[in-house]
Amino acid sequence: MIFSDYITKQDVASLPFGFQHVRTLRSVIDEYYQKAFSPEIINALKITDQSGYMAKLISEHFEGEKTSGSTIESTEQQLQMNLYYICQKFSDCIRKIKLKKNITILIDGIDIRPSQIPYLDYIDCIRGLSNACWSLNTELFANVKDSKGHCRIVLLLRPDIYNSLNLQNAANKLADNAVFLEWRTTYSDYKTSYLYKMANRLLSYNQEKNIFPDIWEEYFDWDIPSSNLKARKKDTAFTEFLKISLSRPRDIQRILSILRNIMIQKGIDSQDKFDYSVFQSNQFQNEYSEYFLSSLKDQLSFYYSEEEYIHFRKFFDYFDSPQFSFDEYHNIYNQYLDYIMDNAPEIPEFMESPKSFLQLLYDSNIIVAIEKDGKYFHFSYREKSPSNIAPMVLYSPDIQYRFHYGLYKKAKLGRYNN
Protein backbone atom coordinates (compact mmCIF):
# COMPACT_ATOMS: atom_id res chain seq x y z
CA MET A 1 0.00 0.00 0.00
CA ILE A 2 2.78 2.45 0.93
CA PHE A 3 4.56 1.69 -2.34
CA SER A 4 1.36 2.25 -4.32
CA ASP A 5 0.80 5.62 -2.66
CA TYR A 6 4.44 6.71 -3.02
CA ILE A 7 4.93 6.03 -6.72
CA THR A 8 4.43 8.98 -9.09
CA LYS A 9 3.55 9.21 -12.77
CA GLN A 10 7.15 10.18 -13.56
CA ASP A 11 8.32 6.82 -12.20
CA VAL A 12 6.21 4.79 -14.62
CA ALA A 13 7.23 3.97 -18.17
CA SER A 14 5.09 5.52 -20.92
CA LEU A 15 3.00 2.49 -21.77
CA PRO A 16 -0.73 2.33 -22.47
CA PHE A 17 -2.54 2.29 -19.14
CA GLY A 18 0.87 2.22 -17.42
CA PHE A 19 -0.18 4.45 -14.55
CA GLN A 20 -3.86 3.55 -14.56
CA HIS A 21 -3.33 0.60 -12.20
CA VAL A 22 -1.65 2.82 -9.63
CA ARG A 23 -4.28 5.54 -10.07
CA THR A 24 -7.04 3.04 -9.37
CA LEU A 25 -5.43 1.87 -6.16
CA ARG A 26 -4.72 5.43 -5.11
CA SER A 27 -8.36 6.35 -5.54
CA VAL A 28 -9.23 3.48 -3.20
CA ILE A 29 -6.74 4.73 -0.63
CA ASP A 30 -7.99 8.32 -0.92
CA GLU A 31 -11.59 7.28 -0.52
CA TYR A 32 -10.76 5.14 2.48
CA TYR A 33 -8.99 8.02 4.25
CA GLN A 34 -11.38 10.69 2.94
CA LYS A 35 -8.70 12.26 0.74
CA ALA A 36 -6.05 12.13 3.44
CA PHE A 37 -2.38 12.82 2.76
CA SER A 38 0.22 10.10 2.22
CA PRO A 39 -0.49 7.22 4.63
CA GLU A 40 2.10 6.16 7.17
CA ILE A 41 2.59 2.64 8.41
CA ILE A 42 -0.05 3.16 11.10
CA ASN A 43 -2.60 3.70 8.33
CA ALA A 44 -1.52 0.48 6.67
CA LEU A 45 -2.17 -1.25 9.97
CA LYS A 46 -5.58 0.43 10.10
CA ILE A 47 -6.40 -1.11 6.73
CA THR A 48 -5.53 -4.51 8.18
CA ASP A 49 -7.82 -3.87 11.12
CA GLN A 50 -10.73 -2.75 8.92
CA SER A 51 -10.12 -5.10 6.03
CA GLY A 52 -13.79 -5.78 5.30
CA TYR A 53 -14.53 -2.18 4.39
CA MET A 54 -11.32 -1.90 2.36
CA ALA A 55 -12.14 -5.08 0.43
CA LYS A 56 -15.54 -3.65 -0.44
CA LEU A 57 -13.97 -0.40 -1.73
CA ILE A 58 -11.47 -2.28 -3.86
CA SER A 59 -14.23 -4.40 -5.33
CA GLU A 60 -16.20 -1.28 -6.30
CA HIS A 61 -13.22 0.33 -8.04
CA PHE A 62 -12.33 -2.88 -9.88
CA GLU A 63 -15.91 -3.62 -10.84
CA GLY A 64 -16.12 -6.13 -13.63
CA GLU A 65 -12.90 -7.94 -12.70
CA LYS A 66 -13.04 -11.48 -11.39
CA THR A 67 -11.97 -12.00 -7.79
CA SER A 68 -10.54 -15.51 -8.06
CA GLY A 69 -13.77 -17.09 -6.85
CA SER A 70 -14.01 -15.14 -3.58
CA THR A 71 -16.94 -12.82 -2.96
CA ILE A 72 -17.20 -9.67 -0.90
CA GLU A 73 -19.85 -11.28 1.30
CA SER A 74 -17.47 -14.03 2.31
CA THR A 75 -14.46 -11.75 2.76
CA GLU A 76 -16.38 -9.51 5.12
CA GLN A 77 -16.84 -12.45 7.41
CA GLN A 78 -13.31 -13.78 7.32
CA LEU A 79 -10.32 -11.59 8.13
CA GLN A 80 -7.83 -13.78 6.28
CA MET A 81 -9.91 -13.77 3.13
CA ASN A 82 -10.24 -9.98 3.36
CA LEU A 83 -6.50 -9.55 3.63
CA TYR A 84 -5.85 -12.04 0.85
CA TYR A 85 -8.27 -10.20 -1.43
CA ILE A 86 -6.71 -6.80 -0.67
CA CYS A 87 -3.16 -8.10 -1.12
CA GLN A 88 -4.04 -9.75 -4.41
CA LYS A 89 -5.40 -6.50 -5.83
CA PHE A 90 -2.36 -4.52 -4.78
CA SER A 91 -0.05 -7.26 -6.08
CA ASP A 92 -1.85 -7.56 -9.43
CA CYS A 93 -1.50 -3.83 -10.05
CA ILE A 94 2.15 -3.71 -9.00
CA ARG A 95 2.99 -6.59 -11.38
CA LYS A 96 1.62 -4.53 -14.27
CA ILE A 97 3.62 -1.39 -13.45
CA LYS A 98 6.74 -0.81 -15.55
CA LEU A 99 9.11 1.51 -13.67
CA LYS A 100 11.70 3.75 -15.30
CA LYS A 101 14.04 3.56 -12.31
CA ASN A 102 14.55 1.69 -9.06
CA ILE A 103 12.54 2.79 -6.04
CA THR A 104 13.79 1.98 -2.54
CA ILE A 105 11.61 2.40 0.54
CA LEU A 106 13.70 2.78 3.72
CA ILE A 107 12.05 1.90 7.02
CA ASP A 108 13.88 3.51 9.93
CA GLY A 109 13.37 3.73 13.69
CA ILE A 110 12.90 0.00 14.17
CA ASP A 111 15.81 -0.31 16.60
CA ILE A 112 14.13 1.99 19.14
CA ARG A 113 11.84 -0.14 21.27
CA PRO A 114 8.99 1.77 22.95
CA SER A 115 9.35 1.29 26.70
CA GLN A 116 5.72 0.19 27.07
CA ILE A 117 6.18 -2.75 24.67
CA PRO A 118 7.85 -5.85 26.19
CA TYR A 119 11.05 -6.97 24.48
CA LEU A 120 9.75 -10.37 23.31
CA ASP A 121 6.56 -8.83 21.89
CA TYR A 122 8.59 -6.23 20.00
CA ILE A 123 10.94 -8.88 18.62
CA ASP A 124 7.90 -10.75 17.29
CA CYS A 125 6.72 -7.56 15.56
CA ILE A 126 10.09 -6.95 13.92
CA ARG A 127 10.37 -10.59 12.90
CA GLY A 128 6.99 -10.38 11.19
CA LEU A 129 7.96 -7.13 9.47
CA SER A 130 11.26 -8.65 8.30
CA ASN A 131 9.53 -11.71 6.86
CA ALA A 132 6.93 -9.53 5.15
CA CYS A 133 9.62 -7.36 3.53
CA TRP A 134 11.53 -10.46 2.46
CA SER A 135 8.39 -11.89 0.89
CA LEU A 136 7.56 -8.68 -0.98
CA ASN A 137 11.12 -8.19 -2.23
CA THR A 138 11.65 -11.76 -3.43
CA GLU A 139 8.17 -12.91 -4.45
CA LEU A 140 6.55 -9.74 -5.77
CA PHE A 141 8.90 -6.88 -6.60
CA ALA A 142 11.68 -9.06 -8.04
CA ASN A 143 9.25 -10.81 -10.39
CA VAL A 144 7.82 -7.76 -12.15
CA LYS A 145 8.62 -8.53 -15.79
CA ASP A 146 9.85 -6.17 -18.52
CA SER A 147 10.49 -3.33 -16.08
CA LYS A 148 13.70 -1.28 -16.11
CA GLY A 149 13.29 -0.41 -12.46
CA HIS A 150 12.21 -2.40 -9.44
CA CYS A 151 10.97 -1.60 -5.98
CA ARG A 152 12.74 -2.72 -2.85
CA ILE A 153 11.98 -2.36 0.84
CA VAL A 154 15.00 -1.93 3.10
CA LEU A 155 14.88 -2.21 6.89
CA LEU A 156 17.46 -0.05 8.65
CA LEU A 157 18.34 -2.44 11.43
CA ARG A 158 21.33 -2.91 13.72
CA PRO A 159 23.23 -6.19 13.19
CA ASP A 160 22.74 -7.28 16.81
CA ILE A 161 18.96 -6.84 16.52
CA TYR A 162 18.89 -8.72 13.23
CA ASN A 163 20.75 -11.55 14.93
CA SER A 164 18.15 -11.57 17.73
CA LEU A 165 15.32 -12.25 15.27
CA ASN A 166 16.43 -15.86 14.68
CA LEU A 167 15.15 -15.85 11.11
CA GLN A 168 15.30 -18.92 8.92
CA ASN A 169 18.28 -18.80 6.53
CA ALA A 170 19.35 -15.58 8.26
CA ALA A 171 22.91 -15.69 6.91
CA ASN A 172 21.78 -16.16 3.30
CA LYS A 173 19.16 -13.43 3.60
CA LEU A 174 21.77 -11.04 4.95
CA ALA A 175 24.34 -11.93 2.31
CA ASP A 176 21.86 -11.52 -0.55
CA ASN A 177 20.06 -8.41 0.65
CA ALA A 178 22.18 -6.39 3.08
CA VAL A 179 24.27 -3.37 2.16
CA PHE A 180 27.57 -3.53 4.03
CA LEU A 181 28.94 -0.06 4.77
CA GLU A 182 32.68 -0.43 5.25
CA TRP A 183 33.84 2.44 7.47
CA ARG A 184 36.61 0.52 9.23
CA THR A 185 40.20 1.45 8.62
CA THR A 186 43.65 1.30 10.22
CA TYR A 187 45.98 3.92 11.64
CA SER A 188 48.42 3.48 8.76
CA ASP A 189 45.93 3.31 5.86
CA TYR A 190 43.15 5.64 6.97
CA LYS A 191 43.72 8.13 4.13
CA THR A 192 42.36 5.58 1.65
CA SER A 193 39.23 4.88 3.73
CA TYR A 194 35.68 6.00 3.08
CA LEU A 195 35.57 7.37 6.63
CA TYR A 196 38.43 9.77 5.92
CA LYS A 197 36.88 10.78 2.60
CA MET A 198 33.62 11.48 4.41
CA ALA A 199 35.45 13.65 6.95
CA ASN A 200 37.14 15.61 4.15
CA ARG A 201 33.79 16.06 2.45
CA LEU A 202 32.26 17.28 5.69
CA LEU A 203 34.93 19.95 6.16
CA SER A 204 34.70 21.05 2.52
CA TYR A 205 31.04 22.13 2.81
CA ASN A 206 30.39 25.87 2.57
CA GLN A 207 33.90 26.54 1.31
CA GLU A 208 34.06 29.26 -1.32
CA LYS A 209 36.53 27.16 -3.23
CA ASN A 210 37.86 23.78 -2.31
CA ILE A 211 41.50 24.44 -3.14
CA PHE A 212 42.83 21.72 -0.85
CA PRO A 213 42.40 18.12 -2.01
CA ASP A 214 43.19 17.04 1.57
CA ILE A 215 41.40 19.77 3.51
CA TRP A 216 41.46 17.72 6.70
CA GLU A 217 45.20 18.30 7.08
CA GLU A 218 44.66 22.06 6.74
CA TYR A 219 42.33 22.07 9.74
CA PHE A 220 44.26 19.47 11.75
CA ASP A 221 48.02 19.91 11.47
CA TRP A 222 48.62 18.28 14.83
CA ASP A 223 52.04 16.69 15.30
CA ILE A 224 51.57 13.99 17.92
CA PRO A 225 54.22 11.56 19.22
CA SER A 226 53.58 8.05 17.98
CA SER A 227 51.90 5.61 20.34
CA ASN A 228 53.60 2.79 18.39
CA LEU A 229 57.00 3.73 16.98
CA LYS A 230 57.38 0.32 15.36
CA ALA A 231 54.33 0.96 13.18
CA ARG A 232 54.51 4.72 12.46
CA LYS A 233 56.69 7.73 13.13
CA LYS A 234 53.91 9.93 14.47
CA ASP A 235 50.20 10.02 15.16
CA THR A 236 47.74 12.45 13.61
CA ALA A 237 44.42 14.00 14.55
CA PHE A 238 42.57 11.34 12.60
CA THR A 239 44.34 8.47 14.34
CA GLU A 240 43.41 10.10 17.65
CA PHE A 241 39.79 10.26 16.53
CA LEU A 242 39.87 6.60 15.53
CA LYS A 243 41.11 5.60 18.98
CA ILE A 244 38.17 7.12 20.81
CA SER A 245 35.50 6.24 18.23
CA LEU A 246 33.91 3.14 16.74
CA SER A 247 34.85 4.23 13.21
CA ARG A 248 31.35 5.59 12.59
CA PRO A 249 30.68 8.79 10.64
CA ARG A 250 28.50 10.10 13.48
CA ASP A 251 31.42 9.68 15.90
CA ILE A 252 33.67 11.84 13.73
CA GLN A 253 30.91 14.41 13.31
CA ARG A 254 30.34 14.51 17.07
CA ILE A 255 34.03 14.99 17.82
CA LEU A 256 34.17 17.93 15.40
CA SER A 257 31.03 19.42 16.91
CA ILE A 258 32.34 19.21 20.48
CA LEU A 259 35.69 20.72 19.49
CA ARG A 260 33.98 23.58 17.69
CA ASN A 261 31.59 24.33 20.56
CA ILE A 262 34.39 24.40 23.14
CA MET A 263 36.47 26.73 20.95
CA ILE A 264 33.46 29.05 20.66
CA GLN A 265 33.01 28.99 24.45
CA LYS A 266 36.68 29.85 24.95
CA GLY A 267 36.53 32.66 22.39
CA ILE A 268 39.12 31.09 20.09
CA ASP A 269 36.76 30.20 17.26
CA SER A 270 38.38 32.79 14.98
CA GLN A 271 41.35 30.46 14.53
CA ASP A 272 41.52 28.73 11.16
CA LYS A 273 42.65 25.43 12.69
CA PHE A 274 41.29 23.15 15.41
CA ASP A 275 43.20 23.47 18.68
CA TYR A 276 44.90 20.33 19.98
CA SER A 277 44.81 21.58 23.58
CA VAL A 278 41.00 21.61 23.36
CA PHE A 279 41.04 17.94 22.33
CA GLN A 280 43.23 17.15 25.35
CA SER A 281 41.07 19.11 27.78
CA ASN A 282 38.98 17.53 30.52
CA GLN A 283 35.93 19.30 29.10
CA PHE A 284 36.28 17.59 25.75
CA GLN A 285 36.92 14.17 27.29
CA ASN A 286 33.92 14.57 29.59
CA GLU A 287 31.57 15.65 26.79
CA TYR A 288 32.71 12.97 24.36
CA SER A 289 32.55 10.27 27.03
CA GLU A 290 29.01 11.41 27.82
CA TYR A 291 28.14 11.03 24.13
CA PHE A 292 29.73 7.57 24.03
CA LEU A 293 27.75 6.38 27.05
CA SER A 294 24.57 7.93 25.68
CA SER A 295 25.01 5.87 22.50
CA LEU A 296 25.60 2.81 24.66
CA LYS A 297 22.41 3.45 26.60
CA ASP A 298 20.43 3.76 23.36
CA GLN A 299 21.82 0.42 22.21
CA LEU A 300 21.11 -1.41 25.46
CA SER A 301 17.67 0.13 25.97
CA PHE A 302 16.41 -2.09 23.15
CA TYR A 303 16.95 -5.10 25.39
CA TYR A 304 16.83 -3.80 28.96
CA SER A 305 14.80 -1.47 31.15
CA GLU A 306 15.97 1.84 32.60
CA GLU A 307 16.44 0.22 36.00
CA GLU A 308 18.51 -2.61 34.52
CA TYR A 309 20.72 -0.08 32.73
CA ILE A 310 21.32 1.79 36.01
CA HIS A 311 22.46 -1.46 37.60
CA PHE A 312 24.59 -2.18 34.53
CA ARG A 313 26.43 1.15 34.94
CA LYS A 314 27.38 0.14 38.47
CA PHE A 315 29.73 -2.48 37.02
CA PHE A 316 32.33 0.18 36.12
CA ASP A 317 32.67 1.23 39.77
CA TYR A 318 34.48 -1.99 40.62
CA PHE A 319 37.53 -1.16 38.48
CA ASP A 320 40.60 0.84 39.47
CA SER A 321 42.28 0.36 36.09
CA PRO A 322 40.89 0.29 32.54
CA GLN A 323 42.80 -2.92 31.74
CA PHE A 324 42.17 -6.20 33.52
CA SER A 325 43.00 -9.87 33.31
CA PHE A 326 40.72 -12.87 32.91
CA ASP A 327 41.04 -13.72 36.63
CA GLU A 328 40.45 -10.12 37.69
CA TYR A 329 37.30 -10.08 35.62
CA HIS A 330 35.94 -13.17 37.36
CA ASN A 331 36.65 -11.74 40.81
CA ILE A 332 34.91 -8.47 39.95
CA TYR A 333 32.01 -10.30 38.32
CA ASN A 334 31.37 -12.16 41.58
CA GLN A 335 31.42 -8.91 43.56
CA TYR A 336 29.09 -7.32 41.04
CA LEU A 337 26.75 -10.31 41.20
CA ASP A 338 26.51 -9.82 44.98
CA TYR A 339 25.49 -6.22 44.35
CA ILE A 340 22.82 -7.33 41.85
CA MET A 341 21.46 -9.92 44.29
CA ASP A 342 21.14 -7.28 47.01
CA ASN A 343 19.74 -4.41 44.92
CA ALA A 344 17.90 -5.65 41.84
CA PRO A 345 14.30 -6.94 42.18
CA GLU A 346 15.29 -9.84 39.92
CA ILE A 347 18.52 -10.95 38.29
CA PRO A 348 18.81 -9.38 34.80
CA GLU A 349 19.24 -11.72 31.89
CA PHE A 350 22.69 -10.28 31.15
CA MET A 351 23.93 -11.76 34.48
CA GLU A 352 23.24 -15.32 33.36
CA SER A 353 26.94 -16.25 33.55
CA PRO A 354 30.39 -14.60 33.59
CA LYS A 355 30.88 -15.51 29.93
CA SER A 356 27.50 -14.15 28.78
CA PHE A 357 28.10 -10.87 30.60
CA LEU A 358 31.56 -10.55 29.06
CA GLN A 359 29.97 -11.25 25.67
CA LEU A 360 27.55 -8.37 26.27
CA LEU A 361 30.46 -6.04 27.05
CA TYR A 362 32.16 -7.19 23.86
CA ASP A 363 29.02 -6.94 21.69
CA SER A 364 28.49 -3.39 22.95
CA ASN A 365 32.11 -2.45 22.11
CA ILE A 366 32.74 -1.58 25.74
CA ILE A 367 35.84 -3.77 25.87
CA VAL A 368 38.59 -4.94 23.56
CA ALA A 369 40.08 -8.43 23.90
CA ILE A 370 43.89 -8.36 23.85
CA GLU A 371 45.71 -11.45 22.65
CA LYS A 372 49.38 -12.44 22.99
CA ASP A 373 50.45 -9.55 25.23
CA GLY A 374 49.19 -6.84 22.95
CA LYS A 375 50.07 -8.33 19.58
CA TYR A 376 46.41 -8.61 18.55
CA PHE A 377 43.46 -6.43 19.54
CA HIS A 378 39.93 -7.68 18.94
CA PHE A 379 37.00 -5.24 18.87
CA SER A 380 33.56 -6.56 18.07
CA TYR A 381 32.85 -3.85 15.50
CA ARG A 382 36.11 -4.64 13.72
CA GLU A 383 35.43 -8.38 13.65
CA LYS A 384 31.90 -8.05 12.23
CA SER A 385 31.13 -8.96 8.62
CA PRO A 386 28.04 -10.05 6.66
CA SER A 387 29.00 -13.66 7.36
CA ASN A 388 29.83 -13.02 11.03
CA ILE A 389 27.46 -10.45 12.50
CA ALA A 390 27.87 -11.72 16.07
CA PRO A 391 31.58 -12.43 16.71
CA MET A 392 32.36 -14.26 19.94
CA VAL A 393 34.59 -12.75 22.61
CA LEU A 394 37.88 -14.51 23.35
CA TYR A 395 37.42 -16.19 26.71
CA SER A 396 40.46 -17.81 28.28
CA PRO A 397 42.98 -17.13 31.09
CA ASP A 398 45.66 -15.86 28.69
CA ILE A 399 43.46 -13.01 27.37
CA GLN A 400 43.59 -9.45 28.69
CA TYR A 401 40.73 -6.99 28.38
CA ARG A 402 40.55 -3.20 28.27
CA PHE A 403 37.71 -0.71 28.30
CA HIS A 404 37.21 1.46 25.24
CA TYR A 405 38.96 4.84 25.38
CA GLY A 406 35.73 6.62 24.56
CA LEU A 407 34.10 5.93 27.92
CA TYR A 408 37.08 6.48 30.25
CA LYS A 409 36.01 9.77 31.84
CA LYS A 410 32.33 9.09 32.52
CA ALA A 411 33.04 5.54 33.64
CA LYS A 412 35.48 7.00 36.22
CA LEU A 413 38.42 5.18 34.67
CA GLY A 414 40.58 8.29 34.49
CA ARG A 415 41.77 10.28 31.51
CA TYR A 416 42.49 8.86 28.10
CA ASN A 417 46.12 9.51 27.12
CA ASN A 418 47.42 8.53 23.70
Per-segment meaning from a language model:
Residues F3-V12, S115-Y119, A142, S164-N166, ...:
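Short, solvent-exposed secondary-structure capping/transition elements
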Residues A231-N418:
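C-terminal leucine-rich, beta-strand-based interaction scaffolds used for sensing/assembly
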Residues P39-I58, S135-S147, N177-M198, S245-S257, ...:
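Hydrophobic transmembrane alpha-helix bundles
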Residues M1-T48, D176, R184, S188-Q207, ...:
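Extended charged low-complexity segments that act as oligomerization/scaffolding linkers
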Residues L25-Y32, S59-M81, L136-D146, E182-T185, ...:
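Charged, low-complexity, helix/coiled-coil-prone segments
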Residues M1-T104, R113, P159-Y162, E352, ...:
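P-loop NTPase nucleotide-binding core
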Residues Y84-L106, I110-L229:
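The catalytic "switch" region of P-loop NTPases
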